[in-house]
Amino acid sequence: MTTTDSGTGKLVRTQGVTAPLGFRAAGIAAGIKASGKPDLALVFNEGPEYAAAGVFTRNKVKAAPVLWSQQVLTSRRLRAVILNSGGANACTGPEGFQDTHRTAEELARALSNWGTETGAGEIAVCSTGLIGDRLPMDKLIPAVTEIVHEMGGGLSGGTDAAHAIMTTDTVPKEAAFHHRDKWNVGGMAKGAGMLAPSLATMLVVLTTDAAVTAEQLDTALRKATRLTFDRLDVDGSCSTNDTVLLLANGASEVTPSQEELEAAVFAVCDDLAAQLMADAEGVTKRVRVTVTGAANEDEAVTAARAIARDSLVKTALFGSDPNWGRVLAAVGIAPITLDPDRISVSFNGNPVCVNGVGAPGARQVDLSGADIDVLVELNVGDGEAMIRTTDLSHGYVEENSAYSS
């Protein structure tokens, strides 16, 4: 699927942060990665407005670039975002924060020399990769000037940037929504491991040419994040570097309603979250766990997350085993209201458990396909929620045992 039409616009997966008007981007190899692959990305807002919003990891151990970006976003204004892969710059002490500050200052200087007067306080910095090592500033600083001159105004610059933020990702992740009223939202994401509730181990940059305020962006982003990235839970691990940013420049001169803005931002975030799930480390099954009939939405999220994180459930799904007993066992230890005799479970629309007991033919349900929908009906209220997750495969174990963090 590369294009999806709706009544209000079109969602496209072959475009990203440069799909909206007035944004440039680039991705280059700075030499941070030993492989020589692209590892530095830049997203630049040409204006005329520079409204911005962001959400960050809830991990108490925050990387230097997270602390920096949280600080600069208090102004609710950003001209640029610079992102590196190949090093998280987390748990690196005061020196790591100084490296982040220096990166922003060097980019501000390069942009100003390029012809756009920019201050370091208008630049967000994001990093991803191994925790505990400082970045090779002798390679990074010269590359900051180089990437400014590599910025393109076309779609290819956005794709280059999406490639440059990849770590264990196997494919770049982009999405754009083109509203029928001639305004747009674009985005790129990275993340393949440590996918968990506080946004997943992800860097996400979203852009829009809508004429909206930073307050409107903040509301739209928080609503979208709560229903998409916050409900992506592959392995229960929460990163030190999670960052989602949304920039707006008003270049379209169109002011959508708040509802229209929220719908478009959600559409892009939801598609990016689906792409993150599909490219999770070692994934062989894309799984959606939906809980209905919970006492309230919060309890539905708790129940769905308990199932999504359960190793026995995940290994059963890896083996295409319709083991509904493991689902009941997982939900049974969740701190929620439930009646065991009212729980029903379905796999891909096939009932396997009704009112707490097995349904006829439950063991014969075919789960050999790549997509599995798990529906759990608690029947104690009207709360519902969906969590995206994956199976637990040999590939996941092998990849994470070989990848230092």
UniProtKB/Swiss-Prot annotation:
Its EC number is 2.3.1.35, 2.3.1.1. GO terms for molecular function: glutamate N-acetyltransferase activity; L-glutamate N-acetyltransferase activity. Gene3D superfamilies: arginine biosynthesis bifunctional protein suprefamily, ArgJ beta chain, C-terminal domain, L-amino peptidase D-ALA esterase/amidase. Pfam families: ArgJ. The record marks 128-129 as: Involved in the stabilization of negative charge on the oxyanion by the formation of the oxyanion hole. The active site is at residue 201. Keywords: Acyltransferase, Amino-acid biosynthesis, Arginine biosynthesis, Autocatalytic cleavage, Cytoplasm, Multifunctional enzyme, Transferase. Pathway: Amino-acid biosynthesis; L-arginine biosynthesis; L-ornithine and N-acetyl-L-glutamate from L-glutamate and N(2)-acetyl-L-ornithine (cyclic): step 1/1; Amino-acid biosynthesis; L-arginine biosynthesis; N(2)-acetyl-L-ornithine from L-glutamate: step 1/4. HAMAP family: ArgJ. Heterotetramer of two alpha and two beta chains. This is Arginine biosynthesis bifunctional protein ArgJ. It comes from Nocardia farcinica (strain IFM 10152). The lineage of its organism: Bacteria, Bacillati, Actinomycetota, Actinomycetes, Mycobacteriales.
